[in-house]
Amino acid sequence: MPRYYCDYCDTYLTHDSPSVRKQHNAGYKHKANVRTYYQQFEEQQTQSLIDQRIKEHLGQAAAFQAGAPFNQHMLAFPGAVARPRLPILPTPGMPHGFPQAPLMPGVRPPILPAPGVPGYPGAPPTMPQPGAPPGSMPQPGAPPGSMPQPGAPPGSMPMQMAPLPRPPTLPPPTSGVPGAPIPNSAAPPAIYQANPPAPAGPTSGAPPAPPTAPQPAFSYALPSEGNH
């Protein structure tokens, strides 16, 4: 009678019947062997994928290293044209047509300047100084549109706009006669006089003030008690 072979457990069963297979598959040893088998299979697949990626990376690096000597060998032939290098941006003090140095390996190219920086291409032109000889260069570092002082020598600082004058401050309003001191709340009130006395004599050469007419006195009679 043929016997059943279990691939996970690597063993033969005593009988090849459905009941015996079911009993064997329900055992803890069979389940542990199945779990171990699939863990090993997953590890093998992961390792094979890692090895494949490493081989691809090494192949690309080897092809790049082999291509560098080949390019140098091709440049040795007459009539070969070298690959153009990246251009270098000129500095403000560098004249036009200045030979550009080749880029060194591992050195970053210069950073583009901010738009509007004086001295670089694309910056707004600066106005020349009035009275300066023709062909003179404007003052470096001056803001665009700044006007230098008229008649100033070349290279002088541009004329700066004076700030607007501040409006005059008005004094606080005062009550009473103009020019009188501000009354104090703690001082006693002055006694009002209807006709102030004339001065004793002239003090500054002015004519004396005319005398004032006396005020008429009014008297009122009190009503008697018999009138009530």
From Swiss-Prot:
Residues 178-190 have a biased composition (Low complexity). It is found in: Nucleus. InterPro entries: Matrin/U1-C_Znf_C2H2, Matrin/U1-like-C_Znf_C2H2, U1-CZ_Znf_C2H2, U1_snRNP-C, Znf_C2H2_sf. Pfam families: zf-U1. GO terms for molecular function: mRNA binding; pre-mRNA 5'-splice site binding; U1 snRNA binding; zinc ion binding. Residues 107-156, 164-175, 196-214 have a biased composition (Pro residues). Its main location: nucleus. SUPFAM superfamilies: beta-beta-alpha zinc fingers. U1 snRNP is composed of the 7 core Sm proteins B/B', D1, D2, D3, E, F and G that assemble in a heptameric protein ring on the Sm site of the small nuclear RNA to form the core snRNP, and at least 3 U1 snRNP-specific proteins U1-70K, U1-A and U1-C. U1-C interacts with U1 snRNA and the 5' splice-site region of the pre-mRNA. Belongs to the U1 small nuclear ribonucleoprotein C family. PANTHER family: U1 SMALL NUCLEAR RIBONUCLEOPROTEIN C (PTHR31148:SF1). This is U1 small nuclear ribonucleoprotein C-2. It comes from Sorghum bicolor (Sorghum).
